[in-house]
A protein has these predicted regions:
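A short, Trp-centered hydrophobic/proline-enriched beta-strand micro-motif
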Residues: 174-184
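A short core secondary-structure module
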Residues: 207-251
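A glycine-rich, basic-preceded beta-loop-alpha segment at the flavin cofactor/substrate interface
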Residues: 246-248, 255, 270-298, 315-332, ...
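C-terminal amphipathic alpha-helical interaction region
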Residues: 441, 451-544
Length: 544
């Protein structure tokens, strides 16, 4: 009852108490497909436990608290001493501890680790996307650190630990550590070769002093950072610890925290280096080459993060429409709403399937799979992150006015949705990276064609899309102006090939018709009415 004025009816129950992993049929199928059979029992148990935690009222409340109480910068203590600390709400630390404890930075430590971790990361993004940032950077720092055996021995066991220690202490005193990275500067943005931060060698081999700044430095309370700076031989990668071996704070000077559209639980800082101690990682002048694997890993996490946000939004929309009645029946049963939900579910599943396939390529590690990643990761990062915002906004509209209210959780998803398209290089950077791979690494295109070729002959619309892509690539003159179109086609063809091979026929048919065959519109809810829309929606229901 609501006082004596009316009875509250026709309001869907909150979507809580369910297994976020186990109720996601597309994600479960992808994990089962890519993991070796002997790994499945353990992975099922771990992912279901994480999924149940993610769907719990407690963790969802922590997510709200972490976003309603954003981080706060403290540059000095009460005596005027420089401390450069960021205070987070306790809910942030609880969530981050859960994420680290679930192995979301430990993909490198066990067989099938990338697929297992990718599924977990996709689930975890649906709880609170902000703490995905330090989890992602910590996970991604491992391959860069492994270029230096001494640094790897010191740091990698701590980065891949399942222990979260929030206190800033020397690395040698910690069982677990988090990592960040800093590349962007005011004058350059994505053009890191324009960086002006300088590195002056010290007497001890491999050590330097940095002078300069970074314009965006997320998760600034991490234990260490990989940064790019100009050494005597050119742009070089460095490790900057927050705390030095003797326990003193490094000169890591936090200037202010960014006021951001979304990602409010996570701190993104402007930082200055003034006599900042650093260790070189890799050779001088090879900074981009050293850090490139870290960038590739975080770009894949942008794909997974966007897939997670889409799944969260679609699950809320389908759940709402399964309970809400209007015009004589459930919204779920209204033909037009069913079309909208089916279209959204299709986009969500395509993103999930693509993200898990790329994670499986990371587990494989062979030359063929690495070549595939070289072209597929930037294409996927370009396309999936671009699709996230329209999916989330349309899903929020399915809730009507309720979806515009903060308590629904949908506004937080909307604010978060554009971020992954900006992180680790915006859309143009990704599209141009696809072109770079085509020109410099012909084996990447060969690996891609071999991958999508496994589905040839199964659907005429997919076959035609592959042919059209090859026609597009036949002449790369003026390709820069077509780079987005090319990247989009790469992503769609790869998604289509995976769905044709592995998804239920109704899913593959709908994707090929609307995304490859031209039988769809510019907005969601324009699928051909002859498709099995009910099956698509039922597959997406987050059944408790």
């Amino acid at each position: 009852m609501a006082g004596s004025t009316h009875t509250v009816t026709n309001q869907p129950p909150p979507l809580l108490g369910h297994d976020v992993y186990g109720t996601d049929q597309a994600l479960v199928a992808a994990v089962e497909r890519h993991l070796d059979p002997e790994l499945l029992d353990e992975a099922r148990g771990e992912l279901s436990a994480l999924g149940r935690a993610a769907g719990s009222a407690q963790l969802q409340e922590w997510a709200v608290q972490a976003n309603e109480n954003p981080p706060r910068l403290r540059t000095h203590d009460r005596y005027g001493h420089r401390i450069d600390e960021v205070d987070f709400h306790p809910a942030w630390h609880r969530l981050l501890g859960k994420g680290v404890g679930a192995g979301l930075t430990a993909a490198w430590t066990r067989p099938g680790g990338h697929v297992r971790r990718a599924a977990g990361f996709l689930v975890w993004t649906q709880v609170e996307a902000g703490n995905g940032c330090p989890l992602s950077m910590t996970h991604a720092a491992v391959p860069a650190l492994r270029t230096d055996p001494e640094l790897a021995a010191e740091w990698v066991p701590r980065l891949t630990s399942t222990i979260y220690e929030r206190e800033l202490r020397p690395a040698g005193q910690k069982a677990g550590a988090l990592f960040g990275m800093g590349m962007t500067e005011k004058q350059g943005g994505s053009d890191v070769r324009a960086n002006t931060t300088s590195a002056r060698p010290l007497a001890e081999a491999g050590t330097y002093v940095l002078t300069g700044h970074k314009w965006f430095c997320s998760a600034p309370m991490s234990d260490g950072f990989l940064v790019l700076a100009q050494a005597p031989e050119g742009l070089t990668c460095f490790l900057v610890p927050r705390v030095l071996e003797d326990g003193t704070r490094n000169r890591f000077l936090l200037q202010r925290l960014k006021e951001k559209l979304g990602n409010r639980s996570n701190a993104s800082a402007e930082v200055e280096f003034d006599g900042t101690w650093a260790r070189r990682v890799g050779e001088e002048g090879r900074g981009v080459r050293t850090i490139i694997d870290m960038v590739a890993a975080t770009r894949l996490d942008c794909v997974l993060g966007s897939a997670g946000l889409m799944r969260a939004a679609v699950a809320q929309a389908v759940h709402h429409c399964a309970y809400r009645e209007a015009f004589g029946g459930r919204l779920l049963d209204q033909p037009l709403m069913r079309n909208v939900l089916a279209d959204l579910a299709l986009e969500s599943e395509a993103a999930t399937v693509l993200g898990l396939r790329l994670a499986a390529a990371c587990d494989d590690g062979g030359e063929q799979e690495r070549a595939l990643l070289r072209i597929a990761v930037p294409a996927a990062k370009y396309w999936v992150t671009k699709r996230c915002t329209p999916v989330v906004v349309e899903a929020a509209e399915c809730l009507g006015g309720n979806g515009y209210v903060e308590e629904s959780g949908m506004p937080r998803l909307v604010r978060e949705s554009p971020l992954n398209s900006v992180w680790e290089g915006a859309g143009n950077v990704q599209a141009l990276d696809v072109l770079r791979a085509l020109r410099r690494e012909p084996q990447a295109l060969n690996a891609f064609l071999q991958e999508v070729g496994r589905a040839r002959g199964a659907d005429h619309r997919l076959d035609a899309a592959i042919k059209d892509l090859l026609t597009e690539l036949a002449d790369l003159d003026g390709a820069q102006a077509r780079a987005r179109r090319i990247a989009e086609r790469f992503a769609l063809v790869l998604q289509g090939s995976l769905l044709v091979r592995f998804a239920p026929p109704e899913v593959a048919d709908a994707f090929c018709a609307s995304r490859l065959g031209g039988d769809g519109g510019g907005a969601f809810g324009t699928l051909p009415h002859t498709l099995d829309l009910r099956a698509l929606v039922e597959r997406a229901r987050p059944l408790a």
